[in-house]
A protein has these predicted regions:
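Active-site SXXK
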Residues: 34, 72, 106-109, 235, ...
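Active-site beta-strand/loop architecture of penicillin-binding DD-peptidases
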Residues: 65-70, 256-276, 280, 289-295, ...
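Conserved catalytic neighborhood of penicillin-recognizing serine enzymes
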Residues: 335-336, 375, 380-440, 446-448, ...
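Membrane-proximal periplasmic segments of bacterial cell-envelope enzymes
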Residues: 1-576, 583-594, 600, 613, ...
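Mid-domain, small-residue-enriched loop/turn segments at the edges of structured enzyme/sensor domains
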Residues: 592, 687-693, 725-767
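Short active-site loop at a secondary-structure junction
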Residues: 335-341, 587-593, 626-654, 671-674, ...
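Conserved active-site-proximal loop/helix segments of enzymes involved in bacterial cell-wall
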Residues: 77-80, 88, 670-707, 752-759, ...
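Second-shell loop/turn segments in exported
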Residues: 54-56, 86-99, 217-225, 285-288, ...
Length: 940
């Protein structure tokens, strides 16, 4: 046995197998030693180094501060919400598979979100319009250039004509962008043609957002915010099949009283690149995912409201998933901002102003000054009814009938255009109104689309002059434009090298026909004539209001309209009377207004109203693209702040400035009498008083303010212009008017913390400037500041902020009343004369303030003409109580016909403020109870 073993070992050690075994054992020993060194001896060091490579910081956004009114009523706050998010960290065998599966998954979750009443988070700068076209939403050229650079992956100055794509990258249209990103080009999204237009757009929006996080895949991309329980449940239940999609807790910005306060507060949204670059200069804690104030006080007080972001350190694996949170620094909440605004007064002022405007519209329809056909068409023209739904698969019978009729009219209109372009020889001046409207739209589209190179047109050219004079046909003009190279042929389907002028013109005609076929403005022109001819009836339009959900469906009313028991006229008048259809929706004159109420003792703003308003909840957090587009297309322009941005002549409200100038410079005194004969004959154009052919007779300054006597103030302006030299000098007169208007602050902004236009004092014609005409141009808030100075002798710097309080309740900033004392401009007796005149104005307004007791009011009316084709603007400025003013009010109703209408709205607002009547009682009279007055003629 032993010998056998020895023999075996002898043979083994002497064999080649031994050498092989020895080598294997040696190598295994080396491997064991290496593993021991890596894991035991140096394991901690390698682990540490590995962790440092994948340790990532994540910002925790601070809770934004709240906004309150002066009484602590909550206006803006944060609400806990759930968001659907995605991390693009799936594993795919190829780029093609990645695109296909990710697009499919996004389409699935987007459909779930939409089918359950949600909407996708969309800050993509291209919107899909109702008519299926795309447009950009940029607010600056810089933003657009940066976007194009990002899309095409190169610096903007390197963008050029791309032969493969067929367009110039630097001038890419919104449609070009969607087509490019949807394609299978390098780093594009390869979206299948099986997806319809809306689905393709939604996928592009999401894929582009995901692309922004391509270098930080551990960060999530938001698909939808503030989703409901049904969507949350779906995502959680399908988490095993929805790759990278999950639910996250979030906060969203919410606003109370949105319609009444949106023009002041504004809204928040995701920070843009431009905003990030600007804000980061002063605060490097901003990230490109932060929510910031986009407009209004949210933007102005961003640094106070924002708070301080926290941070957490995390470990992420090689595909970007978070494995562990290793530390966290909690954020610090933002400060709360308290406004000087009383929201209840703000709301009441808005409603009473709206009722006054509705009352004017109601009375003008009733009198026939606004034809009922204009009201019918307004429902189409201002998009109250949705034209794009007329041919939808679920269109109502009424919608289908209107669309069928429209289709025939569209073909007739296109035939008219074809005929004119093919053989028309008559100038536009001899065209029918309808055909002229068609070609006005055609030329507008060519200009907007960039085909007509308007900057290259020689306006001194004789042929161009003939076109402007209406003696040239569209056919001849467009052919001439081609010959002068005023047409951009790169946008036409022609061979740019070899096409002759005839081929270019044929292509241009084809372009026009295609463009008009799908143009919304052109469709509205056709509908206007269909309404006027009865091809679309008032009955049909009234039924559409129910079919499309503009009004709550009511079987009995619908039946009565359909069978003729209720006429369209009676139905619409009832809805206007009850303000179920608002002046803003109709966008007829008048449809806008503003009012500012100020505390005379402190200069604080108690109400600053712009009508109409909008729902800033739909623009905050993520913009509701459809809603935003509807606001942009709304002819009442609700995004415009009519209190701080609209400028008009002040009309006779300016006469306190002229009184001040005349008294201070000694060209009149408190007892001076000027004889009004109804006409002023000292200058060549011989302007008339509003009372002409009547006359006011002898008036002193107080009586002239009461009567709003133009001749008195023409004379004052004339005397100021003649003061220094004894002879009339236009420039000299303007020097004095500008001096005293400036004392009242009418050459500077009020100081309010939102967008405001700078008022401008007239620069010519002192005689006309003295009655508030010439080129005087003021905002409502500048008139408020002016009348507050008249009432108090102080020119205040306005502010909307009352105080700012931190999270612990400590006041960090307090409103400090700042003013300039202007009381020394006049003697007390001169001030008294002006104040007496303003009191007499109100006492003389029997149709407005007759029977008004409880508080004495002083004021001044003003009617300002802007254009002859529209009604005059209605203005009123005043204060109360007359003997010891507490508040001032400045009201403007744009195109409001008569100043009495602005005075009536002011009366009701003052009545509410002093608790003389309840808001319910004031609103109970409805539109028909408003004593709307005035024509388009100036009456004061």
């Amino acid at each position: 046995m032993i010998y056998d073993i020895k023999d075996f070992l002898k043979k083994f050690f002497s064999s080649r197998l031994f050498v092989l075994a020895a080598v294997i054992i040696f190598m295994f020993a080396l491997l064991a030693e290496r593993v021991f060194t890596l894991q035991i001896i140096k394991g901690a060091d390698y682990q540490k180094n590995f962790i440092m490579l994948i340790k990532k910081p994540l910002s925790i956004e601070a809770s934004r501060g709240n906004i309150y009114d002066v009484n602590g009523e909550l206006l803006a706050y944060n609400q806990l919400a759930y968001s659907v998010v995605i991390s693009d960290n799936g594993s795919y065998s190829s780029t093609k598979e990645h695109n296909r599966l990710l697009n499919k998954e996004l389409n699935e979750i987007i459909n779930v979100i939409k089918n359950n009443g949600g909407s996708i988070y969309n800050d993509f700068p291209v919107v899909l319009n109702d008519d299926g076209t795309y447009s950009f939403t940029f607010t600056s050229e810089t933003s657009k250039k940066r976007f194009l650079s990002d899309v095409f992956g190169k610096k903007y100055d390197k963008l050029e004509y791309n032969k493969a794509l067929g367009f110039d990258e630097a001038n890419a249209s919104a449609q070009n962008i969607i087509d490019f990103l949807s394609s299978d080009q390098n780093e594009c999204f390869d979206i299948s043609s099986k997806y319809d237009t809306q689905a393709t757009y939604d996928i592009v929006v999401m894929r582009y957002a995901i692309k922004q996080n391509r270098f930080t895949k551990y960060k999530t991309t938001t698909i939808a915010k503030d989703v409901n329980d049904s969507i949350v449940a779906y995502v959680n239940e399908h988490s095993d099949t929805l790759t990278g999609i999950s639910i996250e807790e979030d906060t969203i910005r919410k606003y109370n009283y949105p319609e009444y306060i949106s023009s002041l507060i504004g809204y928040t949204g995701k920070i843009s690149t431009d905003e990030y670059n600007e804000l980061s200069k002063d605060d490097d804690s901003y990230t490109q995912n932060d929510m910031v104030g986009k407009s209004g006080l949210e933007q102005y007080y961003e640094s106070y409201l924002r708070g301080k972001n926290g941070e957490k350190q995390v470990y992420v694996n090689n595909v970007g998933k978070i494995n562990e949170v290793i530390s966290q620094k909690n954020p610090v909440s933002g400060n709360d901002v308290y406004l000087s605004i009383d929201i209840k007064l703000q709301e009441a002022t808005y409603k009473l102003l709206e009722q006054e405007i509705a009352g004017i519209v109601y009375s003008k329809i009733k009198s026939g000054e606004i034809p009922i056909s204009d009201v019918y068409f307004a429902l189409i023209n201002n998009n109250v009814v949705d034209l794009t739904h007329f041919n939808a698969s679920d269109a109502s019978a009424t919608e289908q009938a209107i669309y069928n009729s429209f289709s025939g009219q569209l073909q007739d209109a296109l035939s008219t255009i074809d005929s004119e372009l093919e053989s028309g020889t008559s100038g536009t001046a001899s065209m029918s109104e309808q055909t002229l409207d068609y070609f006005t739209c055609v030329m507008s589209v060519l200009n907007d689309d960039g085909l007509l190179l308007s900057k290259q047109i020689d306006t001194s050219d004789s042929t161009y002059a003939s076109w402007k004079a209406g003696t040239l046909s569209p056919r001849d003009y467009l052919k001439y434009c081609i010959s002068k190279q005023w047409i951009d042929i790169t946008k036409l389907d022609v061979d740019q090298k070899y096409a002759d002028s005839s081929e270019i013109y044929t292509a241009l005609c084809s372009y026009i026909k295609d463009a008009m076929t799908d143009n919304k403005d052109f469709a509205k022109i056709i509908y206007k004539y269909m309404v006027n001819s009865g091809a679309v009836t008032g009955q049909q339009l009234c039924l559409l209001l129910f079919d499309q959900g503009v009004l709550d469906y009511d079987d009995a009313t619908v039946s009565n309209i359909a069978n003729g028991s209720i006429s369209p006229y009676a139905f619409l008048m009832d809805k206007i009377n009850n303000i179920e259809i608002t002046p803003a929706q109709l966008a007829l004159d008048p449809c806008t207004g503003s009012c500012v109420i100020t505390d005379v003792k402190t200069g604080q703003l108690k109400a600053l109203v712009s009508y109409p308003g909008y729902d800033n909840n739909k623009l905050a957090n993520t913009v509701d693209a459809d809603y935003y587009q509807s606001l942009r297309e709304d002819k009442s322009n609700p995004l415009w702040n009519y209190a701080t941005q609209e400028q008009t002549a002040p009309g006779s409200t300016f006469k306190m400035v002229s009184s001040t100038a005349g008294l201070a410079e000694g060209v009149i005194d408190t007892s001076s009498k000027i004889n009004c004969t109804g006409i002023f004959t000292e200058i060549s154009n011989q302007p008339k008083c509003w009372i002409y052919p009547g006359a006011h007779g002898m008036d002193n300054v107080s009586e002239a303010l009461r009567d709003s006597c133009n001749v008195f103030f023409y004379t004052t302006g004339f005397r100021l212009a003649s003061k220094d030299t004894g002879s009339y000098d236009d420039e000299n007169g303007m020097k004095y008017i500008q001096k005293y208007a400036s004392i009242y602050g009418l050459d500077q902004k009020s100081g309010v913390e939102i967008v405001e236009k700078t008022p401008s004092i007239a620069t010519q014609y002192p005689v006309m400037a003295a009655i508030g005409q010439s080129n005087n141009n003021f905002t409502t808030i500048s008139l408020s500041r002016y009348v507050t100075a008249v009432a108090s002798g102080k020119l205040y710097d306005y502010k909307l902020m009352n105080k700012i309080v931190d999270a612990d309740g400590k006041t960090v900033k307090q409103y400090d009343s700042k003013s300039t004392d202007i009381s020394g401009t006049l003697t007390q007796s001169q001030w008294d004369a002006i104040h007496q005149g303003m009191r007499m104005v109100v006492e003389d307004l029997h149709d407005v303030f007759g029977g008004f007791t409880g508080v004495e009011v002083s004021g001044k009316t003003g009617t300002a003409q802007q254009v002859e084709t529209r009604p005059n603007h209605a203005l009123f400025v005043g204060y109360a109580p007359s003997s010891d003013p507490e508040i001032t009010i400045a009201t403007r109703i744009s195109s409001g016909y008569s100043s009495h209408n602005a005075a009536a709205a002011s009366r009701n607002i003052i009545s509410y403020y002093y608790n003389l009547e309840s808001l319910d009682n004031l609103l109970a009279v409805k539109a028909e109870g408003v004593n709307a007055s005035g024509s388009s003629a100036i009456t004061d």
